[in-house]
């Protein structure tokens, strides 16, 4: 057996029956606690532990052994159920033979042979297709529940269950077309409802449908023969053919629904065949009225289920549409508020631009006014400077004129004085010429030497005399100049 568990999470999902596996569970828990203690000791001794690889392997081994034990117990329970179902079918076949022997000789024996044929085929299918070993806990749980249900049905409540089960028979005459039509509608509605749900359960229901088809065909043939005992063989054969066709349609529909779990329903089909055969043999005489009522109630229930599915679909659509509508409304509100915010931002930007423009214009006008005032002040200061300069110039001119006038007066006085001096010098010269001597200057002579020569002393008084007599202002004389000596 191969281990199909992928991780600890899948392994821990196993369902444990406390009534039958309590001792094994305690042993497993004890082993797990010992293994955990041993793993902790090994991990403390190791420097780099291998991430609990040995622990996971031991847990997988324990889970594999546990699954083997569960599978063996379920297999034995299935064998017991099959044996009990076989004994019940044998009893029912014997009772059907006895009742048919008491009936008139012209009664058709075809349904009995068909029932035996389908029972044999069902058990042959069960033996030829053994149940595969599966490690999935979900499948084991379903199989145990089915086995328990079949066992309790066969042992304790076979009679009550047979009376309560719907009778899969097919009426003859006018009711046959209505019954087949109702079954076809019911099958189509059931197929539409179950197709999206059971896509992954393929081959399991195919075998169940095949077994149910055989049982339904046999039971329908027996019920038809007992409901109308004086019908001929041809009519019975045609009825059984129609029943087989309808059951084959139903089997093909069930086969298209359940696709993945194939060979598991053979034993269930065999048990269903035995129960359906016994129920058909006991209640064929009064089967038409309950079957009609069952069809009506079944149709009503299926219509109710169909309406519920429609309401559920509508509710699902509403649940899907409401969040979408809410999301659209929220997005629209956000878009509106975002547009308003952008519009306000743009308006604020425009207002700021206008305010800045006005402010700039005001600043420019203020600057212009300031420049005008400055130019005015400058022109005023220039004018005042010019006027002050003109005034200063006029004052200076006036002072110059006054000074010139004074200079002219001084010059005139000086000229007068010079004129008088010249006149005096001229008079003195004339006096000297009349009573003094003349000396011609030669070489290096000067007034000091000339005074020594004529007066015997070069005193300043003598020199001054010579100057006065000649009208000299300094000591400068030239060669060849004639000097009067007084």
Swiss-Prot record:
Region labeled Elastin-binding — which residues?
A: 14-34
Q: Where are the transmembrane segments?
A: 205-225, 320-340
Listed Polar residues bias regions: 64-85, 161-179, 233-246
Q: Where is the composition biased (Low complexity)?
A: 204-225, 278-297, 403-431
Q: What is known of its domains?
A: The elastin-binding domain is located between residues 13-33 at the surface-exposed N-terminus, whereas the C-terminus, containing the LysM peptidoglycan-binding domain, is not exposed on the surface of intact cells and presumably remains buried within the peptidoglycan. The presence of the TNSHQD sequence, corresponding to residues 18-23, is essential for EbpS activity but not sufficient, additional flanking amino acids in the amino- or carboxy-terminal are required for elastin recognition.
Q: Which PROSITE patterns match?
A: LYSM
Outline which residue ranges sit on the Extracellular face: 2-204, 341-486
**Protein's gene:** ebpS
- Give one Pfam hit by family name: LysM
Extract the ranges annotated as region (Disordered). Answer: 1-314, 351-440
The highest taxon in the source lineage is Bacteria
The protein's matches in InterPro entries, at most eight in alphabetical order, are given as: LysM_dom (IPR018392), LysM_dom_sf (IPR036779)
**Cytoplasmic side of membrane:** 226-319
Spell out the subcellular localization from the entry. Cell membrane
Record-given protein name: Elastin-binding protein EbpS
Instruction: Name a single GO cellular component.
Output: plasma membrane
**Which keywords label this protein?**
Cell membrane, Membrane, Transmembrane, Transmembrane helix
Q: Where is the composition biased (Basic and acidic residues)?
A: 1-40, 103-118, 126-143, 180-199, 247-259, 299-314, 361-398
Taxon lineage = Bacteria, Bacillati, Bacillota, Bacilli, Bacillales
* NCBIfam families, per the entry: elast_bind_EbpS (NF033598)
Question: According to its record, how does it sit in the membrane?
Answer: Multi-pass membrane protein
What residues does the LysM domain cover?
A: 437-485
Summarizing the function annotation, the protein's role is:
Promotes binding of soluble elastin peptides and tropoelastin to S.aureus cells although it is not able to promote bacterial adherence to immobilized elastin and, therefore, is not a microbial surface component recognizing adhesive matrix molecule (MSCRAMM). May be involved in sensing the environment or in nutrient transport, since its loss caused a growth defect.
